[in-house]
């Protein structure tokens, strides 16, 4: 009886080729049906859609190809992202890091789809350029104006980024089958998904700072959920609890941030437009899928690995929701159809009628729903870990908790207060924001020791189960990628070179123009600063540590480079980001070059406070290590003394025994 039951269970855990083939057929038929509906929408709404936006009509081909291509390319990217995450979360790697056979099947899915994704993204560059110029693709290519049309189209440039990232993913998936490779490939895949999400409606008009941040989170969450649904349907097994938790989390994020985007794009929640109706349709589908996932997670816990049916239905539902979003992406949001755009709307998304003061910096808030929300989540997660340790009766230094929470609070303030609001329009305030993100906040976060806390809180996965969060974190800590990035020399080069590369090249002209550029700079400087200070005062395991004198030397070695950077900004006669700052044309700012010189002075002077903080932390750590070493040596000395006495006593007993014989 027991053997039969075990055999039956083992058999049910392996998806049969027939079940996989049926799932693939259902998804293929559903995909063709969804594409047909999207094509019909593009054909029927074509001329009217362009007339409402005041754009020239490029013809029926572009009117149909744009929404269909947008949907197909977005779906391919989502499937690649979901497949990679599925492999990362379900694989049972061999000792050499190679993924197991079950995960390799999903790897092959991502490998095949990535090539299709590349082709679709490259095609969309031409289609999007034709859409924005109002001519057909053949005429555009024949005129030789394709490059100029692409340069003038933000969405076409977004598709170029997506195509480049898809090329990287497609090439790497054919070369690497190790677990770590899939983790690394999440970076270009997410970048590709975000590249097209931040163009179009989210990147223009009033409140586009809110919309861009929301679009980034929504696009990644929605693509992850869609990709995981399709990957799970093709795998033919019930997703693990970790995958299901990820789906529920992504569904909640997509619903929350999607509602925010609809609020920003549809004035008064008016539902009398195609855009609004499509948004509501996507919302209803997404809500239904999310509620079903919540029921499976809370009421009917999953039994990972068991064969099941019904996965294709959720995957098809997410395809339909993505089709609705693709149709919305090629339309102009109702809010912008009658809005009279100003320079504030185009370049900032909000107005700054008065110059910055301390009171305005503290009270002018535009909460960053990406970085600010991340700061809130990190603070809550750390506090929960701290509380969990205390409930177990384990200790954790309160100073680390204070350092981490202070760093998170500073992150929320820097990204959402007047520092960011004025920093997006003034170079001097932007430089204060940059220095805070690069040199002050990372020190506090590193001193919090989040990795050590996580390793103490997260449970060890039992035998026979897929690795969990603790195992993933351990593998990442000891991976070659982490070893390279956290090496003191690598961290030093990144920390020193970053400001020169960003501000003294055309990169800054692009980044400062768009809100996603400000988000990218903030994340980049925060991560680079964290890597550098991790190598110097890090509590967590990971990077190769220099001796304490070497760490102090490394800290002082960066100071001349930052001083020269600040002095260069103070003495330059040309303006960094001149085109953008002239276009914003703040009425109360008399001179943008004088503001740049002030920013250089801020960069030069603000390096001292973080250095003092790091020196204090280093000296404290050094003194504690010396005390530990001295205490250990004292214990060894005491132990040696006791051992000598014991040996003498035993020798005496042996001698007495010999004399008695």
UniProtKB/Swiss-Prot annotation:
A GO CC term attached to the entry: plasma membrane
InterPro entries from the UniProt entry: Caa3_assmbl_CtaG-rel
One Pfam family, short name: Caa3_CtaG
| Name the record gives this protein | Uncharacterized protein Rv0102
This protein's UniProt keywords: Cell membrane, Membrane, Transmembrane, Transmembrane helix
**Any remaining note in the record?**
Was identified as a high-confidence drug target.
Q: How does it sit in the membrane?
A: Multi-pass membrane protein
User: What species is given as this protein's source?
Assistant: Mycobacterium tuberculosis (strain ATCC 25618 / H37Rv)
Localization (cell): Cell membrane
